[in-house]
Amino acid sequence: MNLAKRILQGEQLTKETVLKIYEDTNIDTLDLLNEAYILRKHYFGKKVKLNMILNAKSGICPENCGYCGQSRDIKQKQRYALIPEEQIIDGAKVAHDNHIGTYCIVMSGRGPSDKEVDHISNTVRTIKSQHPQLKICACLGLTNDEQAKKLKSAGVDRYNHNINTSENYHDNVVTTHSYKDRTDTIELMKANNISPCSGVICGMGESNQDIVDMAFALKEMDADSIPINFLHPIKGTKFGSMDDLTPMKCLRIVALFRLINPTKEIRIAGGREVNLRSLQPLALKAANSIFVGDYLITGGQPNQLDYDMINDLGFEIDYDTCENKENKNDVSRAN
């Protein structure tokens, strides 16, 4: 197969080639994962970047995303307005203490008001004064140019806005905004020199072609960071009874994304615990980044299990990306 060697020599794989490889049952998933690992090791060694999410505003949303427990169609959900600055700042301290490189501040809704952007901006300034090396990622929805400039000025390093699925499959997932709304948001951030983060949710009924199209769309978008979420079905949502993933399929997807985006940060995100299950460690053979702790409205596994997983693989936390470098040689003692 020698895919990694070909890619390192400059070959650009086509969609047709990647789809054929992905669907070829004669190509063992672990062999494909090994090709991805060659690329991951070449560009990132054995380092793992750690990320943490804070749900700063929950359940107040007019959108009808079929995967989301915060959508307008869900009656029973956790709802609260944008939390006080102090709580967000406290979350940054927790991130620092847990060797987190990127702290992600997330808000529900179509997009933030100007008042909410000012609130986030003021908070980020305070966090940066206390933890200057902690990277801040904002995920606030659709924004305008003035809001993007405020976030940049405040010190926001990265902005997340996932494409979630392929352009072709988009309207099966959500109809209250367009695929272009999402890609335009990422382009706006790039225009304001904010690092673009955009990823996907797999397991919503998309085809193999859709999976390939997603990976190539993110390559064309030149997203710096690509979170791969695996659907964690939530009762009451459109995809609440979906069961389309196996651990091996998840690994195959992650390997495919690494082959197409060899130099990018690829993050294993929501749903990894319930979908990868005992094979979670193998995902880090292709991915070089994970979320630790809880997600927006679903729980994650205890941080210590993630530290142990990294250690057991012979990998290490990417201390170059985090401010807290204590316990550098023994993450098992981390809190």
Curated annotation (Swiss-Prot):
The lineage of its organism: Bacteria, Bacillati, Bacillota, Bacilli, Bacillales. It comes from the Bacteria. Pathway: Cofactor biosynthesis; biotin biosynthesis; biotin from 7,8-diaminononanoate: step 2/2. Homodimer. [4Fe-4S] cluster binds at residues 61, 65, 68. SMART domains: BATS, Elp3. It comes from Staphylococcus aureus (strain JH9). Pfam families: BATS, Radical_SAM. Catalyzes the conversion of dethiobiotin (DTB) to biotin by the insertion of a sulfur atom into dethiobiotin via a radical-based mechanism. Its EC number is 2.8.1.6. This is Biotin synthase.
